């Protein structure tokens, strides 16, 4: 990175490693089937993807049932801001990053809103924890072309409910932050 920042130096990287690209690039071009989908700074690509392809290619993305209501999206019955100029996806779907969701053990005082889910996998990543869940609420069980609806939640390790284990019932809730696309 130090060499890249030397005045007058131009570098071009070609990589399939999204984390590497986000870490070393000032601008990133995302290609899909030989066509450029978006060129932008790493933070803009991640936070404001121009297309559904870019949103799912750069970072983890949940495709959840939801609806757009002007500048808001409704996800699991909760209103969340919709990013201005958000990418368009098929009707009835909203794209949400894992860090834009939270969870609580079902039946706890923190579990009053959201959708019931079952914990499938817990990935401890040091300061972060990624929890893969399967939505078990009747309305959404078979939403995505007959497949089980899954939601990945990523949160600081300090926010992980004490004693959370694979197989536990939880409530997944969107945080009051912007959805990527609708």
Q: In which residue ranges do the predicted regions lie?
A:
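ABC transporter nucleotide-binding domain
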Residues: 41-72, 76
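Non-catalytic connector elements of ABC transporters
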Residues: 61, 71-182
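Gly/Ser/Thr-rich helix-start
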Residues: 30, 35, 56, 60, ...
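ABC ATPase nucleotide-binding domains
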Residues: 1-53
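Residue-level signal for well-ordered alpha-helical positions
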Residues: 27, 57, 107-108
């Amino acid at each position: 990175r130090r060499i890249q920042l030397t005045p007058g130096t131009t570098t071009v990287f070609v990589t399939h490693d999204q984390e590497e690209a986000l870490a070393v690039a000032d601008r990133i071009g995302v290609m899909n089937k030989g066509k450029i989908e978006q060129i932008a700074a790493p933070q803009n690509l991640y936070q404001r993807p121009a297309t559904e392809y870019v949103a799912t290619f750069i970072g983890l993305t949940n495709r959840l049932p939801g609806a757009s209501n002007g500048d808001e999206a409704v996800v699991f019955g909760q209103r969340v801001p919709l990013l201005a100029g958000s990418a368009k996806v098929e009707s009835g779907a909203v794209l949400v990053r894992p860090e834009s969701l939270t969870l609580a053990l079902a039946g706890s005082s923190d579990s009053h809103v959201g959708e019931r889910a079952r914990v499938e996998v817990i990935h401890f990543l040091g300061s972060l924890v990624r929890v893969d869940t399967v939505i078990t609420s009747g309305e959404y069980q078979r939403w995505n072309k007959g497949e089980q609806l899954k939601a990945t939640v990523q949160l600081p390790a300090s926010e992980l409910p004490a004693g959370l284990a694979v197989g536990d019932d939880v409530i997944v809730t969107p945080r009051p932050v912007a959805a990527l696309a609708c």
